[in-house]
């Protein structure tokens, strides 16, 4: 592969961007953050599923920019809350991206719910669109755990301080980055996604 594959990472979330960049092969792919593109558009995330939101963000941004775009949608689904907060994870308490308020609301919603009924999972859906707005690749990853009764740890973001990994008896907020990267929903989705992406890059390079 002589030419770098130009790929826009279609997320405005700086912390998600860091995770994506850490796992994507930058020796093969020229990564550009959405924040680095002046004419990027804001895509309304009004889908009822993570996959619908990821596809919409990827295809609409790709058509607008006429570039390859990788978009991601992720969130937390709690068993006792019938899957909530789900696609509303980032704005569960009303304001988009207010992690503290979202965590506080989740704890209130689970008041008096025993630990054996506090099962939950993080979900991640990745979608790659070509410059014409066609979905070329899509992959998902999940990570099962439980919701703690109080926040622990200052690492990570979002609901990480509440999400307990049973095997480690620690929250994502307490685990070191290496362990979290091995276990997280985003990492699991990327491990499935990257080999497919590299095959597509190879094919694109060969046919160019």
Curated annotation (Swiss-Prot):
Record: residues binding Mg(2+): 73
Cofactor(s) recorded in Swiss-Prot or TrEMBL: Mg(2+)
Signal peptide: none
Pfam families according to UniProt: Ham1p_like
Alphabetic keyword roster: Hydrolase, Magnesium, Metal-binding, Nucleotide metabolism, Nucleotide-binding
Sample GO molecular function, one term: nucleotide binding
Cofactor binding: number and manner: Binds 1 Mg(2+) ion per subunit.
Similarity remark: Belongs to the HAM1 NTPase family.
Chain residues that bind substrate: 11-16, 74, 157-160, 180, 185-186
Subunit architecture: Homodimer.
HAMAP family: Non_canon_purine_NTPase
Disulfide bonds: none
Active site: 73 (proton acceptor)
General function of this protein: Pyrophosphatase that catalyzes the hydrolysis of nucleoside triphosphates to their monophosphate derivatives, with a high preference for the non-canonical purine nucleotides XTP (xanthosine triphosphate), dITP (deoxyinosine triphosphate) and ITP. Seems to function as a house-cleaning enzyme that removes non-canonical purine nucleotides from the nucleotide pool, thus preventing their incorporation into DNA/RNA and avoiding chromosomal lesions.
Catalyzed reaction equations: XTP + H2O = XMP + diphosphate + H(+); dITP + H2O = dIMP + diphosphate + H(+); ITP + H2O = IMP + diphosphate + H(+)
PANTHER family noted in UniProt: INOSINE TRIPHOSPHATE PYROPHOSPHATASE (PTHR11067:SF9), INOSINE TRIPHOSPHATE PYROPHOSPHATASE/HAM1 PROTEIN (PTHR11067)
Protein name (record): dITP/XTP pyrophosphatase
Species the sequence originates in: Rhodopirellula baltica (strain DSM 10527 / NCIMB 13988 / SH1)
């Amino acid at each position: 592969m002589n030419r770098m594959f130009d790929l826009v990472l279609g997320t405005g979330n700086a912390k998600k961007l860091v995770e994506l960049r850490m796992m994507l092969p930058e020796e093969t792919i020229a990564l550009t953050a959405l924040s680095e593109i002046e004419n990027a558009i804001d895509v309304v995330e009004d889908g009822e599923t993570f996959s619908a939101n990821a596809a919409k963000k990827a295809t609409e941004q790709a058509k607008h920019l006429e570039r390859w775009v990788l978009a991601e949608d992720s969130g937390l689904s709690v068993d006792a809350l019938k899957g909530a907060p789900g696609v509303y994870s980032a704005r569960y308490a009303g304001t988009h991206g207010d992690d503290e308020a979202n965590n506080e609301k989740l704890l209130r919603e689970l008041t008096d719910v025993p630990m054996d009924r506090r099962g939950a999972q993080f979900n991640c859906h990745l979608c790659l669109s070509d410059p014409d707005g066609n979905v070329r690749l899509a992959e998902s990853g999940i990570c099962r755990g439980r919701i703690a009764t109080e926040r622990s740890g200052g690492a990570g973001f979002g609901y990480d301080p509440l999400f307990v990994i049973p095997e480690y008896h620690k929250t994502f907020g307490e685990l070191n980055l290496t362990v979290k990267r091995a276990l997280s929903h985003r990492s699991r989705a990327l491990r499935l996604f990257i080999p497919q992406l590299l095959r597509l890059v190879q094919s694109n390079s060969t046919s160019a």
